Structures are given as structure tokens and as C-alpha cells.
Amino acid sequence: MLTKTFQSFLFAGIASGLVLSACTRSGDDEVTFDQVPPVLQEVPPAGQLPDGIIPSAYRLDLYTDPAQDEFTGAVEIDITASEPHARIWLHSIDHSILSAKAMLEDGSELTATFTRSTADGGVSRLDFATPVPQGNSTLIIEYSAPYNFGLAGLYKAEQKDRPYLATQMEPIDARRLVPSFDEPRFKTSWTLTVATPAGNQVITNGALKAQTTLDDGSIQFQFATTREIQSYLVALAVGPYDLRDGGVLPPNEIRARAVPFRGFAPAGKRDQLEEA
């Protein structure tokens, strides 16, 4: 009888030890965030881009010469990734990508490979050998692109043999100006810096902060950061525009703050702004 009792206690002790051992190991076997496979969606998204990447700010640096047929740009896009991404989908039409990378919060960089998609709407992708981690980072893309001649994106037109540039972004043509997450659900701030040959005006949404002459004689215009807006609301015009300064419109029952008022017209047509 004593032997059977001892055997029963021994069996119970072994069983309890196994249970405790399993409980102890569960912490070691817990799947960590680094072990989660990174997002790599194979099929180009139809309709909206995936929800895993959210843009929050754009800093766009352009060189535009209305006399030429193309422009160059460098854009920094601040993003937040909901989880690690080995592939990021975005919009790009007619851009030749010179370089692409992601800069992480610690200053390290991840090189990306750009692939232009055959999907409708210019849906394209950035592939990373080392995934972009969860959290905040910045996409940095250098590119060149032709001016559009069909009143879409950054288009070129001539009047009296003088070339002008202007934008028409709505509804989905900001993706012709800059690689971007070109959907109205994304509202972000935009900071533009635009260089152009002397003699041209540059007009954007932001207030002009500084104007600098570069070593090659070009003029660089630096603009204040906009409030958060959709990409189709970004506006840009470059060329020999005439300027008429209308002063500052004071606050009234409709607007709560003063608003600077200026008008631009093609060269030689400033007088037509008298009644604007």
C-alpha cells in the first residue's frame, strides 16, 4: 500500500513538473515582432493602396526650366508603417527613378528597388532587401520626368512663343508631378523648394520664405510648409508671369484671419489683373 501511494505521488510530481516546464518555456517560445514575416503583397492593389503605410509629410525639391522638356526632383516622404514592409506600393507616372531609399529614425538607410507597374493608375512599387520596420521612417526618391502637354500633372504651354508651366492635379494627377501616395484620404503637409532660371516667377500654395541665387545663376524659391492638404490640392506654376500685388485682405465675417492677395498673368497681361 505504501509503495502504491509513493508511486501515485511520484507520478503526480512528474506530471506537475512537465506542466510547470511547459509554462516556463512558453515565454521563450513567444513570437517576437522581428519574427513576423514582413508585408510583401505580390499583386498590385486595385483601387486604394494598402492601409499599412500612412504618409504624413512631403518635402519636395524641384528644378524646373520651362524652356526644357523635362524636370528633376527629389522628394522626402515621412511615413508610418503598421508592421515591417519588404514592399511598398505607391503612385508614379512617367518618372525615371534615379535612386530610392528609406531613412530610419536612427539615421540608417535601406536601399530600395523601384519597379514601374503595368497596373492602371501608375501603381508602382519599392522593394527592400531589408524590410522597412514598423514605425516612422522617410522615403527618399530622386527622379526626372517629362512635362505633360495634356493639362495633367505639371504641364507645359506656350503663349507668344514663351513657355509656361502650371499644374492640374485633380483628380489623380499629382502622381505625375511626384512619386506619392496620391489618394484623397491622405492629408499631409507639403514643403516645396523650386529652382528655375532667372527671369521666371514661381508660385505655390505656400508663402515665399526665401529667394536665393545659386552658383549656376538659377534662382531658388523656398516656400513655407502648407497645412495638411490632399495631394490634388498642391499647386505650382513657373514661368515669366507678371505679378500684381493686391495687398492683404483683412479679416471679416467670412474669414477669421488676414489673407495676402496676389495675382499672376502671362507676360504682358498684368493690366488684365486690375479688376481681379
Q: Which residue stretches match the model-derived regions?
A:
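Bacterial N-terminal signal peptides that target proteins for export
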Residues: 2-10
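Bacterial N-terminal signal peptides
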Residues: 9-21
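Ligand-binding face of N-terminal immunoglobulin V-set domains in extracellular IgSF glycoproteins
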Residues: 71-94
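Hydrophobic helix-coil surface modules that form long, contiguous segments used
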Residues: 73, 170-172, 180-276
